[in-house]
């Protein structure tokens, strides 16, 4: 559905974007605000959220942005974020779960279990809590859309990235579980799997070097993704043109999933050594 003014039909809806203070989350929130969506962004850093909100409204003077300082691994925080996102219009219409990260790097023989648990907690439990409480609001509103953010690392092995790939695979499965359960209430749940996307978090890679070269060699459409690539699909999945689409895991990666994950040897060998990367541990 494209309206007479060329918009996507999302104007005046209310959408919560977790992890909206930076990176893909900020890109999604900016794109939604440009469509006239009432956007609520949440994250753990209040100052970062304030800067993001200022940037979004500067770029989109007609947009409305609320901020909530919230940790998605804290259930009370998630409840508060969902409530805030519902206030402007009296209901919640959509959610994009961009909050995520990784605290584990290195060979499996050297992974720190506490860092592993924190990563799984953020990526899987945080997404679960967001789905749990946003779905309640969406069911009460008569339906809506949830868009989760996974990673190409959930399907293509990213060696030495520890819990990141396995936890994102959990997001994939959780998405389909929720879609199956919530379809009867007209709540759609779909997942976006970004490939290498230009954000501050991965600037060390996207600025150039052997890892980027390997990414490009294994990406049929050989360029780095932009947050606008992810935001465009998120808008579609939130909007009225996707009302019979649910339970889908969609790669936005230039085709990288057709080949293999990147070679991070040049990045991690100086840290762990060649023997360490193959699993050897000094006695």
Region spans (language model):
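Short C-terminal tail/terminal secondary-structure segment
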Residues: 4, 105, 235, 246-283
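Conserved glycine-rich cofactor-binding loop
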Residues: 21-23
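Substrate-binding pocket helix/loop in short-chain dehydrogenase/reductase
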Residues: 106-108, 115-117, 215
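Active-site helix of classical SDR
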Residues: 131, 167, 175
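Alpha-helical segment proximal to the catalytic Tyr-Lys
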Residues: 136, 180-184, 243
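Residue(s) in the substrate-gating loop at a strand-loop-helix junction
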Residues: 151
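C-terminal helical subdomain
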Residues: 191, 210-245, 252-254, 279-283
């Amino acid at each position: 559905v494209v309206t007479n003014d060329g918009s996507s039909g999302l104007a005046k809806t209310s959408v919560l974007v977790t992890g909206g203070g930076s990176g893909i989350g900020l890109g999604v929130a900016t794109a939604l605000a440009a469509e006239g969506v009432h956007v609520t962004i949440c994250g753990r850093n209040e100052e970062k959220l304030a800067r993001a909100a200022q940037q979004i409204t500067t770029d989109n003077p007609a947009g409305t942005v609320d901020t909530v300082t919230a940790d998605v691994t804290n259930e009370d925080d998630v409840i508060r974020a969902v409530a805030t996102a519902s206030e402007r219009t009296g209901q919640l219409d959509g959610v994009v779960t961009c909050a995520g990260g990784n605290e584990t790097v290195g060979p499996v023989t050297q992974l720190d279990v506490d860092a592993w648990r924190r990563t799984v907690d953020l990526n899987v439990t945080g997404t679960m809590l967001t789905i749990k409480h946003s779905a309640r609001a969406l069911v009460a509103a008569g339906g809506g859309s949830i868009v989760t953010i996974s990673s190409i690392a959930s399907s293509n092995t990213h060696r030495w990235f520890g819990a990141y790939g396995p936890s994102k695979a959990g997001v994939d499965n959780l998405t389909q579980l929720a879609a199956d359960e919530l379809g009867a209430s007209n709540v759609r749940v779909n997942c976006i799997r970004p490939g290498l996307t230009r954000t501050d978090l991965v600037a060390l890679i996207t600025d150039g070097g052997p890892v980027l070269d390997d990414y490009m060699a294994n990406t049929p459409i050989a360029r780095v993704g932009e947050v606008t690539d992810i935001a465009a699909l998120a808008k579609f999945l939130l909007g009225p043109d996707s009302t019979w689409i649910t339970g889908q895991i969609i790669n936005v990666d230039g085709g990288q999933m057709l080949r293999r994950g990147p070679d991070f040897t040049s990045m991690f060998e100086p840290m762990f050594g060649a023997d360490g990367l193959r699993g050897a541990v000094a006695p």
